[in-house]
Regions:
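C-terminal juxtamembrane segment of a hydrophobic transmembrane alpha-helix
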Residues: 1-10
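Short, polar/charged loop or turn motifs at beta-strand boundaries
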Residues: 12-18
């Protein structure tokens, strides 16, 4: 009996660790790629095809094709990386229209990333969006080719799949009420194209991110902020990412009275029978750093 119990708990904890490491790799890679616009380098130079469309958008109410927008109207601030600190369902719904009520686990961070893929596209899909660029000018379009481009992208040129994502912790894994917190992301992979939900790892109970801001323009972080403004995010050069993971099954012989202190989230003293671990990593955000060093 004891051997069976030990095996079950080892398996439970091992699965939690594997899931958490996978989740950390996924979000760390996406954050490190924020602001990658292929050879174009500068998001503000992206132009938009006249027939660019999106099925399910995911921006503030009233803003059309927000997921495609590389910069903020009016300020010109880059939208490559955005943060909602210790979000609630109300704050995430105001910023991202594709979230449904009660989906987010309140008090966890939400991270929005805009970038293109790391390699040129092969065959183009009618249900995807692309950046066509020659390194001097670029056009964002949906479908297999731009039909009303505002600028001509002369050869040699390449097409790059547009890969925006929004990471968050969902309250449930498979259905509302199952109470299995899960790291998910909204991604531009639905028909239309449009935003859809992809879940990465179950048992992720909290996501916290601290952003390294370069205030002296030397390419290195001077301060780490958990709740940066969009203006401050223009000089982000790195990020520290924290995940709190728990087992999906309880351990009937265990009570978890540990205190978990992660970033600026309130301390957690669960008092339940789930095993937990904190996983963390740091990443450099080279694309935004390079733009800053270029004085863009």
């Amino acid at each position: 009996t004891n051997n069976s119990y030990s095996f079950k708990q080892d398996e439970n904890i091992g699965r939690m660790q594997d899931d958490a490491r996978h989740a950390l790799r996924e979000i760390a890679f996406d954050i490190s790629m924020a602001g990658h616009y292929a050879d174009l380098h500068i998001p503000s130079t992206v132009a938009y095809d006249g027939d660019l469309t999106i099925g399910q958008d995911c921006g503030p109410a009233g803003q059309i094709n927000w997921m495609y927008q590389a910069t903020e109207a009016g300020t010109g601030n880059s939208l490559s990386l955005m943060a909602i600190d210790n979000a609630t369902n109300a704050t995430v719904a105001a910023a991202h229209s594709c979230f449904i009520g009660g989906e987010l686990l309140d008090g966890t961070d939400v991270v929005s990333i805009k970038r293109v893929a790391g390699a040129e596209a092969g065959a183009l899909s009618a249900n995807a969006a692309y950046l066509r660029t020659n390194g001097t000018v670029g056009v964002m379009f949906s479908g297999v080719a731009p039909t009303a481009p505002p600028v001509v992208v002369a050869a040699p040129r390449a097409d790059w799949a547009f890969r925006p994502t929004i990471y968050y912790v969902r309250q449930f894994a498979n259905a509302p009420g199952d109470n299995i917190p899960t790291l998910c992301r909204k991604a531009l992979r639905a028909a239309g194209p449009g935003m859809t939900t992809e879940c990465i790892a179950t048992g992720i109970e909290n996501l916290q991110v601290e952003y390294g801001i370069d205030t002296t323009e030397d390419g290195h972080p001077n301060v780490f902020l958990s709740n940066p403004t969009l203006t401050q995010m223009q000089t982000v050069v790195s990020a520290r990412i924290f995940l709190v993971a728990r087992t999906t099954d309880i351990d009937t012989r265990y009570t978890n009275n540990k205190t978990y202190s992660v970033s600026n989230a309130p301390d957690l003293v669960p008092g339940d029978s789930f095993h937990r671990r904190v996983f963390s990593t740091s990443v450099s955000i080279q694309n935004i750093r390079t733009m800053n060093m270029m004085g863009v």
